[in-house]
Amino acid sequence: MRVFQIVYILIISNLIYATSGGGTSSHHHKNDNNIADNTNNNNNNNNNNNNNNITNATTTRTVTTSTKTKTHTGGGVAAMGGILGQNGWFYGDAGLMAAIFGAMLLL
């Protein structure tokens, strides 16, 4: 039963933390520029042909990459928002850990 209480506190703490404005989250898109140029040369397939039409087909693909950064600031959920939120008693990741360990000690 103790394990379930701890897991419950962890889940609830993370939910409160996520909605209270603490921390920073960001994600970066994969850079696809290394596949922007695909070249296909059909030079070796014309050995038995007597024509001089050697086709050089070049396909160029331009990929636009973007970087998005999302930052959560301010706000909070009821009383816990003031504790875990920005400029609260427990601010940032260290504040989240302090709140989690404190809740565990209370169980």
Curated annotation (Swiss-Prot):
Residues 33-56 have a biased composition (Low complexity). Glycans are attached at residues 53, 56. A lipid is attached at residue 76 (GPI-anchor amidated glycine). It comes from the Eukaryota. One of its GO terms (cellular component) is side of membrane. Keywords: Cell membrane, Glycoprotein, GPI-anchor, Lipoprotein, Membrane, Signal, Virulence. Residues 77-107 form a propeptide. Cell surface GPI-anchored protein required for virulence. Mediates hyphal ramification which is important for the interaction with host cells. This is Virulence factor PGA16. It comes from Candida albicans (strain SC5314 / ATCC MYA-2876). The gene is PGA16.
